[in-house]
């Protein structure tokens, strides 16, 4: 059963990155040469997520000053989110105004300028209700 849950979780996260690699929104033009998500099911049933995202901003793109990150459920606490860009802490973490079940990271003076790149690492702990509605079926031998 644990393997099945991990398979479903892995499938969910793979689908997040099945979209085209080049993204354009308003005047933003960037690629994600690296987009990795590690998911850990904790002993208490919560989920911990570790994101590794490398943004390559186009020379013609606008500065990337905010990042909106989607979550698998709304049952998480903003205080359980730690993030950094190129090793420098990101302290502006708030609910996303654009992504339901998501949060926004304000990069402030760490904004990714046109033609530049930045690696963003995000650690989210205590995500709850990930398996809500999953039917547990045990074989009767």
Model-derived features: where do they sit?
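Bacterial N-terminal signal peptides
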Residues: 9-18
């Amino acid at each position: 059963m644990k393997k099945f849950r991990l398979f479903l979780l892995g499938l969910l996260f793979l689908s997040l990155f099945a979209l085209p690699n080049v993204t354009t929104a308003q005047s933003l033009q960037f690629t994600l040469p690296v987009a990795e998500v590690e998911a850990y099911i904790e002993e208490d049933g919560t989920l911990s997520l570790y994101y590794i995202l490398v943004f390559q901003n186009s020379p013609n793109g606008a500065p990337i000053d905010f990042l909106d990150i989607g979550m698998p459920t709304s049952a998480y606490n903003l205080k359980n989110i730690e993030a950094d860009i190129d090793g420098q802490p990101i302290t502006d973490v708030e609910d996303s105004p654009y992504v339901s079940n998501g949060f926004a990271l304000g990069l402030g003076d760490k904004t990714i300028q046109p033609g530049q790149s930045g690696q963003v690492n995000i650690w989210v702990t205590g995500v709850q209700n990930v398996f809500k509605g999953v039917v547990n079926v045990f074989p009767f031998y």
